[in-house]
């Protein structure tokens, strides 16, 4: 899961600096909010935090399909494809929220309704006796609600970044992403610990509380009312025109190819639990280290890499990540025993480094969007970038399931797992062939001059 700026992107001054730097003209932020206490940012952080906190249920969901429904690795990969579908539809969701108002508002009602619906779906997992299909459908609805909520929050991030300096915009984007990482970090260990101490139904009930906090907090969100809706077809035309430039198409293709290759995560989860005997509490500890790594990746980017070019950042991080990514082969072939490294320590260190690199690769594209997005398309453009990533993730689940099945890897047969890990590693390197398609400083400067001349 890796994505992300001579940062050609980072050399761009926000186009909206053609307007007033205090954010005047932003469509959805009230004057009171701009001048006084910025409760909008608080809500944004709460959405990110809640999105991370709902990971409390992630291990319980894994074990639900693995132990309760007794599915094999390739079946679990297939099931976990469906929750990605709503995130692929983020541009559609964003166009809806950008175009259609509810009671004259385009953010607050969507945030309230879908966070409430998400909470109800977690309660359904806890209280209903479900079949595999029904449980999969509920996971789909949980993801649909999360997709709506994060799309609204991302639009608010972009809106609040417009009209500000690049540094201010960078801070807002990274703070939103960090709030997600903090949420995941807060519950990572307990996702496994609680699974050993209590029934998974209690975990689903506890998780349902976090979206409810969003529903309550957004009641205090100040938003300007709109008397009319925008034409969604005009919005779609503007969106296509805006993203149909080399500055976006190259990164879009790179991210999709990078994300769509097979990944050994699901098969390796079965290996760790069934072969190595790792308990849920250790799997929670593993997720805790991933949360810490995400924060460290964000810090490294902000301190050391935000002035590096996009191409350089992606090439270096991909090459560095390759040996780390295939390092579980040392575990599956028991080489770590000869090196005197325990199974647990080896798994913790490798996953930690991969997660940090993932965050470093994601950030430049997010920051690019926040700084050059034209007014009226805030949610749509940001969501399109994430949709490309999630389409790749959906494809990844499909290719992972297919190759896992071909290699006859199941719940207890891991004879070909090392070959599978190596295959996934080479798919990772394949994305480097698309680096020439990424924008350089000249392309960035042309876009900058073009947009400036429009102003």
From Swiss-Prot:
Q: Which GO terms describe its cellular component?
A: plasma membrane
Q: Where in the cell is it found?
A: Cell membrane
UniProt cross-references to InterPro entries, sorted A to Z: BT1, MFS_trans_sf
**Keyword Cell membrane applies:** yes
> Does the keyword section mention Transferase?
no
Bilayer topology reads:
Multi-pass membrane protein
Annotated GO molecular function terms are: folic acid transmembrane transporter activity
SUPFAM superfamilies according to UniProt: MFS general substrate transporter
Q: Which domain of life is it from?
A: Eukaryota
Gene3D superfamilies, from UniProt?
MFS general substrate transporter like domains
Its chief place of residence is membrane
According to UniProt, the reaction catalysed is: folate(in) + H(+)(in) = folate(out) + H(+)(out); (6S)-5-methyl-5,6,7,8-tetrahydrofolate(in) + H(+)(in) = (6S)-5-methyl-5,6,7,8-tetrahydrofolate(out) + H(+)(out)
- Name the residues that span the membrane: 42-64, 84-103, 110-131, 137-157, 177-195, 201-221, 242-261, 281-301, 313-331, 347-367, 417-438
Q: Which residues are glycosylated?
A: 307, 416
The alphabetical list of record keywords is:
Cell membrane, Glycoprotein, Membrane, Transmembrane, Transmembrane helix, Transport
The UniProt activity regulation field reads:
Transport of folates is inhibited by probenecid and methotrexate.
The entry's family comment says: Belongs to the major facilitator superfamily. Folate-biopterin transporter (TC 2.A.71) family.
What is known about what this protein does? Folate transporter with broad substrate specificity. Transports folic acid, folinic acid, pteroic acid, dihydropteroic acid, the folate precursor p-amino benzoic acid (pABA) and the human folate catabolite pABA monoglutamate. Can transport 5-methyltetrahydrofolate with low efficiency.
Its recorded name reads: Folate transporter 2
């Amino acid at each position: 899961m890796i994505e992300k700026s001579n940062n050609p992107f980072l050399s761009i001054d926000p186009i909206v600096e053609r307007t007033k730097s205090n954010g005047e003209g932003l469509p959805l932020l009230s004057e009171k909010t701009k001048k006084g206490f910025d409760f909008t940012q608080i809500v944004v952080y709460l959405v990110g935090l809640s999105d991370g906190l709902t990971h409390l249920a992630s291990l319980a969901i894994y074990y639900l399909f693995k132990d309760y429904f007794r599915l094999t690795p390739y079946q679990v990969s297939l099931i976990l494809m469906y929750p990605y579908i709503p995130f692929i539809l983020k541009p559609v969701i964003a166009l809806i929220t950008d175009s259609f108002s509810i009671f004259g508002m385009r953010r607050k009602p969507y945030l309230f309704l879908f966070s409430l619906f998400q909470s109800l779906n977690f309660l359904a997992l806890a209280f209903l006796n479900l079949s595999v299909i029904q449980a999969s459908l509920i996971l789909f609805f949980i993801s649909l609600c999360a997709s709506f909520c994060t799309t609204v929050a991302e639009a608010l991030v972009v809106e609040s970044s417009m009209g500000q300096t690049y540094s201010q915009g960078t801070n807002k984007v990274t703070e939103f992403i960090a709030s997600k990482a903090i949420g995941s970090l807060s519950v990572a260990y307990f996702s496994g610990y609680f699974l050993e101490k209590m029934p998974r139904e209690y975990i689903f009930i506890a998780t349902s509380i976090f979206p409810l906090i969003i529903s309550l907090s957004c009641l205090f969100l100040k938003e300007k009312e709109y008397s009319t809706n925008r034409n969604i077809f005009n919005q779609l035309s503007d969106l296509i025109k805006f993203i149909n430039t080399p500055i976006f198409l190259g990164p879009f293709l790179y991210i999709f190819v990078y994300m769509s290759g097979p990944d050994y995560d699901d098969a390796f989860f079965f290996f760790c639990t069934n072969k190595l005997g790792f308990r849920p509490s250790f799997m929670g500890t593993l997720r805790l280290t991933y949360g810490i790594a995400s924060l460290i990746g964000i810090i490294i980017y902000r301190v050391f890499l935000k002035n590096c070019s996009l191409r350089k950042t992606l090439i270096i991080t991909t090459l560095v990540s390759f040996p780390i990514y295939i390092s579980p082969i040392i575990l599956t072939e028991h080489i770590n025993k000869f090196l005197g490294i325990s199974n647990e320590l080896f798994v913790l260190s490798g996953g930690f480094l991969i997660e940090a690199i993932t965050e470093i690769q994601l950030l430049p594209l997010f920051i690019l969007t926040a700084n050059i997005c034209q007014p009226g398309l805030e949610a749509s453009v940001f969501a399109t970038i994430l949709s490309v990533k999630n389409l790749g993730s959906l494809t990844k689940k499909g290719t992972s399931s297919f190759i896992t099945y071909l290699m006859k890897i199941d719940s207890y047969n891991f004879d070909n797992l090392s070959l599978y890990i190596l295959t996934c590693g080479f798919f990772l390197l394949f994305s480097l062939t698309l680096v020439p398609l990424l924008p350089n400083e000249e392309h960035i400067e042309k876009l900058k001059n073009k947009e400036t001349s429009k102003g």
